[in-house]
């Protein structure tokens, strides 16, 4: 009597929907007696939970874990039925070795969300298995026995093998199957919302690439036609005028004005701009000689004035003679290293002088215009084998004259620049796609967009089935391919 009251109370409490767990996520355990609210899904299916429960939280179900076993296939009702038979057979073999407490099935929580399905221990709340929805390929419940429920999930890794996980619950197997299907529908809708925009952008990229290929093909055709026309024109010119003197170019044009042979005719020969010629005659006018000035015996010069005075006034002065018209000497190029007299040179006075040094004085070079002079010749310099534009060559070291190592940002810039350099052509480089190939790619994207619009996209479809009336636990059948002598402790 007390047991029946406990079951009735448990069923009434399990009808509370939308409670909050410790982590603040929504969870629900639908009742088997209360009528359930139906929600229409995006794929035409009927949902039993509000979408927010699975999107923002999760839905929890309490069940007992029967066990798991590997399966040869990832889907199929026959595969799940055979796996459940194998699990029950293994449990019955171990029942004789177990006590009454250990023989009980483990009680677990099944947490279903839009991201994954988690199997956790009901006492410790520690997750036992975590299955992303993408790894679950098949889900089935028994239409006759409402307690049996199983799903097939693939193990982690690319080469993970599928395994069947079986559970028993208090007439909630169908609800668990519908909840997992609802999670798949919502994940599928989220996938469409995220990928529809990317597919449309990919379609536009393919259209632009196709246009580029068409323009490049047209440009190549025009280049070939132009080269053919130029070859035809050059052939016609060769037949008419003969081979050209300058290959590829026409003869140069002659200048219209003649080249001048001398200075302009309107400049007189006595001008300072005229240069002496070989046939010029020497000047006929010579400079007058001046009278010698004699000195007296006492050393005083006689009073000789250039102009004598008279009572009537000063005598007129004789105008100075006009200098002869002499041509200037030819220009002389300046010397690069003029010779400096050692007597009047400051360099000679400071020769061999070195201030503030205890070492013997070294003779300084006498040529102050020597280009090889280096004032930093005594300093220690760092020599680099090759200049690295992305390295830290511009940062000189402060210890022992060593170079500072390149920074991480400089190495990153160098790697990015090297990656952007055009790679040499090799056999591994794929050839360029043609316009027909881009047409095929555009058609594939359009098919995916059409499938998204109609809801027939193949991604995220969960296959469901019926276990077909699993026999009772006492009337199980022996699986055909699950007999293991080592596990059964039997002699071969």
Curated annotation (Swiss-Prot):
Descriptive protein name: Cell death protein 6
Designated gene of the protein: ced-6
Homology family: Belongs to the ced-6 family.
Compositional bias (Pro residues): 244-268, 313-333
Domain notes: The PTB domain is required for interaction with trim-21.
A Pfam family recorded for this sequence: PID
A GO molecular function held by the record: scavenger receptor binding
Keywords (A to Z) from UniProt: Apoptosis, Cytoplasm, Developmental protein, Phagocytosis
Record's subcellular location: Cytoplasm
Keyword Cytoplasm: yes
Residue span(s) of domain PID: 55-215
GO CC term (a single one): phagocytic vesicle
Compositional bias annotation for Low complexity: 19-29, 300-312
Residue span of region Disordered: 19-38, 241-385, 464-492
Organism of provenance: Caenorhabditis elegans
Compositional bias per record (Basic and acidic residues), positions renumbered to this chain: 373-383
Function: May function as an adapter protein in a pathway that mediates recognition and phagocytosis of apoptotic cells during normal development. Promotes engulfment of cells at both early and late stages of apoptosis. Required for actin reorganization around apoptotic cells. Plays a role in protecting dopaminergic neurons from oxidative stress-induced degeneration. Mediates recruitment of E3 ubiquitin-protein ligase trim-21 to the apoptotic cell surface which promotes ubiquitination and degradation of ced-1.
Summary of subunit composition and partner proteins: Homodimer. Interacts with ced-1. Interacts with E3 ubiquitin-protein ligase trim-21.
Signal peptide feature range: none
Tissues expressing the protein: Detected in gonadal sheath cells.
């Amino acid at each position: 009597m007390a047991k029946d009251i406990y079951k009735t109370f448990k069923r009434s409490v399990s009808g509370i929907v939308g409670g909050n767990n410790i982590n603040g996520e929504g969870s629900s355990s639908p009742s088997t007696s209360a009528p359930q609210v139906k929600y229409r899904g995006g794929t035409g299916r009927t949902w039993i939970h509000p979408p927010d429960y699975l999107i923002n939280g999760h839905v929890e179900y309490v069940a007992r874990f029967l066990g798991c076993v590997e399966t040869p296939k990832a889907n199929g009702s026959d595969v799940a039925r055979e796996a459940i038979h194998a699990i029950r057979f293994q449990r019955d073999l171990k029942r004789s070795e177990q006590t009454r407490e250990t023989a009980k099935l483990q009680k677990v929580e099944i947490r279903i969300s839009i991201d994954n399905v988690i199997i956790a221990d009901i006492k410790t709340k520690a997750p036992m298995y975590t299955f992303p929805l993408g790894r679950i390929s098949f889900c089935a419940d028994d239409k006759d026995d409402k307690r049996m429920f199983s799903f097939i999930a693939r193990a982690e890794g690319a080469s993970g093998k599928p395994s069947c996980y079986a559970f028993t619950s208090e007439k909630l197997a169908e609800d668990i199957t519908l909840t997992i299907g609802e999670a798949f529908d919502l994940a599928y809708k989220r996938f469409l919302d995220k990928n529809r925009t990317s597919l449309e952008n990919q379609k536009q990229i393919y259209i632009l690439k196709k246009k580029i290929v068409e323009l490049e093909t047209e440009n190549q055709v025009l280049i070939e036609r132009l080269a053919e026309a130029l070859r035809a024109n050059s052939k016609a010119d060769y037949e008419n005028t003969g081979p050209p003197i300058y290959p590829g170019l026409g003869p140069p044009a002659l200048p219209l004005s003649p080249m001048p042979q001398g200075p302009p005719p309107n400049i007189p020969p006595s001008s300072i701009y005229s240069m002496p010629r070989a046939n010029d005659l020497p000047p006929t006018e010579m400079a007058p000689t001046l009278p010698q000035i004699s000195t007296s015996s006492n050393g005083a010069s006689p009073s000789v004035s250039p102009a004598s005075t008279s009572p009537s006034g000063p005598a007129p002065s004789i105008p100075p003679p006009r200098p002869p018209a002499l041509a200037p000497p030819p220009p002389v190029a300046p010397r690069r290293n003029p010779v400096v007299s050692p007597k009047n040179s400051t360099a000679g006075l400071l020769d061999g002088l070195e201030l503030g040094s205890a070492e013997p004085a070294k003779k300084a070079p006498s040529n102050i215009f020597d280009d090889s002079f280096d004032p930093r010749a005594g300093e220690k310099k760092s020599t680099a084998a090759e200049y690295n534009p992305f390295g830290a060559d511009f940062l000189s070291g402060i210890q022992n004259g060593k170079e500072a190592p390149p920074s991480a940002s400089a190495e990153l810039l160098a790697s990015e620049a090297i990656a952007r350099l055009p790679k040499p052509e090799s056999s591994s480089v794929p050839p360029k796609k043609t316009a027909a190939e881009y047409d095929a790619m555009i058609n594939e994207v359009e098919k995916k967009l059409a499938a998204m619009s109609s809801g027939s996209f193949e991604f995220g479809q969960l296959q469901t089935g019926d276990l077909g009336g699993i026999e009772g636990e006492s009337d199980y059948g022996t699986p055909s391919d699950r007999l293991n002598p080592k596990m059964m402790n039997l002699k071969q």
